Curated annotation (Swiss-Prot):
The lineage of its organism: Eukaryota, Viridiplantae, Streptophyta, Embryophyta, Tracheophyta. Signal peptide: none annotated. It comes from Oryza sativa subsp. indica (Rice). This is Bidirectional sugar transporter SWEET6a. One of its GO terms (molecular function) is sugar transmembrane transporter activity. The keyword rRNA processing does not apply. The chain crosses the membrane at residues 10-30, 46-66, 70-90, 104-124, 132-152, 166-186, 190-210. Forms homooligomers and/or heterooligomers.
């Protein structure tokens, strides 16, 4: 019989693979930006928000905050590189006004992270307190971002069209939420359960809406169906013992598509 830790380890690895794949979801959008050398109406906000979440989870996973959480650091470290690349492309092809706004938001995020790091390391002196404080921040910001699909779901209901809510992305996001919720429930972890439970719930609602409205969606439209990623959240807490005593990290991603 497989042990709970081994089962959780397997689920965690699957979740990390899905999380990495979803980090790459906006590639078509940025390929379009590079080809046209223009960001058009796309916004940097989702990628700036994801960058902050990745920074928080990387900090959460380092040994001085939550020991033996290597997969938390690796998946979110990869996320930092991916989101940083997206933002660099966005910066290169944005007008000066958007560039200034990006720099301002990024500056605020860096100041916030510095405050969190100093506050946690100097004010909390045990791993339990440090992981609790940073974990709560991660859950708070991650849960807020999970409400972004409400906009596109409202649009689907209003237009009776799922044109801008692709089935594949909705399905993968649902499976990702279910995967990490199962991971969290094997050995209950509140920090992973809350955001991923929301992810599974909203993913299920999107699939239900797709089933209801895909027949009424126009088969051909003039608008390009470019994939924008308003919110992508990768979260994790070390909990399952990996080989050699390490723990795996959880991940949750919400992907919605906007015109």
């Amino acid at each position: 019989m497989i042990s709970p830790d081994a089962a959780r380890n397997v689920v965690g690895i699957i979740g990390n693979v899905i999380s990495f794949g979803l980090f790459l979801a906006p590639v078509p959008t940025f390929w379009r930006i590079c080809k046209r050398k223009d960001v058009e109406e796309f916004k940097a906000d989702p990628y700036l928000a994801t960058l902050l979440n990745c920074m928080l989870w990387v900090f959460y996973g380092i040994p001085v905050v939550h020991p033996n959480s290597i997969l938390v650091v690796t998946i979110n470290g990869i996320g930092l590189l991916v989101e940083g690349t997206y933002l660099l492309i966005f910066f290169l092809y944005s007008p000066n006004k958007k560039r200034l706004r990006m720099c301002a938001v990024l500056g605020v995020e860096l100041v916030f992270m510095l405050a969190v790091i100093l506050g946690v390391l100097l004010g909390a002196h045990t791993h339990e307190k440090r992981s609790m404080i940073v974990g709560i921040l991660c859950v708070f910001f991650g849960s807020i971002m999970y409400f972004s699909p409400l906009t596109i779901m409202g649009k689907v209901i209003k237009t009776k069209s799922v044109e801008y809510m692709p089935f594949f992305l909705s399905l993968v996001c649902f499976l990702n939420g279910v995967c990490w919720t199962a991971y969290a429930l094997i050995r209950f972890d509140i920090y992973v359960t809350i955001p991923n439970g929301l992810g599974a719930l909203f993913g299920a609602i999107q699939l239900i809406l797709y089933a209801c409205y895909y027949r009424t969606t126009p088969k051909k439209t003039k608008a390009a169906k470019d994939v924008e990623m308003p919110s992508v959240v990768v979260s994790g807490t070390g909990a399952a013992a990996a080989a050699g005593g390490g723990n795996t990290g959880g991940g949750s991603i919400s992907v919605t598509v906007e015109r």
